[in-house]
Amino acid sequence: MVQGPNTHRNLDDSPAGPLLILSPCAGTPTRSPAAPDAPDFRLPCHFGRPTRKRGPTTPPLSSPGKLCATGPRRVYSVTVCCGNCGKELTFAVKTSSTSLLGFEHLLNSDLDLLCPRCESRERHGKR
């Protein structure tokens, strides 16, 4: 339901998908041939807040240049809304672009990530 002053616009009441921003972190070295950059995914947050892309994050140290069956692995910064309160959660993942697309599909269809506060409430049965 949309609340606010009377307007002459017809607003869509259906919620949009979750916020999902997947982008490669800057300065990630790889030992394999250069792969084309994965696209920067921007989907609207279902809580109606505008999306804001943050700067590159410093990825955690790990074994460099690993290759997996689906191609070279790179570090990506992921920003998604909490499934309960809508707070932005940002974390880094290291994967191939093919696996990243599968992760995007999972986040858009069946998986809700929770912030620490909402996770604690769910664990203790509070809503």
UniProtKB/Swiss-Prot annotation:
Keyword Metal-binding: yes
Gene3D superfamilies in the cross-refs: 3.30.160.330
Keywords assigned: Activator, DNA-binding, Early protein, G1/S host cell cycle checkpoint dysregulation by virus, Host cytoplasm, Host nucleus, Host-virus interaction, Inhibition of host innate immune response by virus, Inhibition of host interferon signaling pathway by virus, Interferon antiviral system evasion, Metal-binding, Modulation of host cell cycle by virus, Oncogene, Transcription, Transcription regulation, Viral immunoevasion, Zinc, Zinc-finger
Region described as E7 terminal domain: spans on this chain: 2-56
Compartments, record wording: Host cytoplasm; Host nucleus
Stretches annotated zinc finger (unnamed): 82-118
One annotated GO molecular function: protein domain specific binding
Location of the motif Nuclear export signal: 100-108
SUPFAM superfamilies: E7 C-terminal domain-like
Residue stretches in coiled coil: none
Stretches for region Disordered: 23-66
Keyword Repeat: no
GO biological process: DNA-templated transcription; symbiont-mediated perturbation of host cell cycle G1/S transition checkpoint; symbiont-mediated suppression of host innate immune response; symbiont-mediated suppression of host type I interferon-mediated signaling pathway; symbiont-mediated transformation of host cell
Main location: host cell
Domain comment, as recorded: The E7 terminal domain is an intrinsically disordered domain, whose flexibility and conformational transitions confer target adaptability to the oncoprotein. It allows adaptation to a variety of protein targets and exposes the PEST degradation sequence that regulates its turnover in the cell.
Subunit structure: Homodimer. Homooligomer. Interacts with host RB1; this interaction induces dissociation of RB1-E2F1 complex thereby disrupting RB1 activity. Interacts with host EP300; this interaction represses EP300 transcriptional activity. Interacts with protein E2; this interaction inhibits E7 oncogenic activity. Interacts with host TMEM173/STING; this interaction impairs the ability of TMEM173/STING to sense cytosolic DNA and promote the production of type I interferon (IFN-alpha and IFN-beta).
Entry similarity comment: Belongs to the papillomaviridae E7 protein family.
Protein name: Protein E7
Organism: Bovine papillomavirus type 1
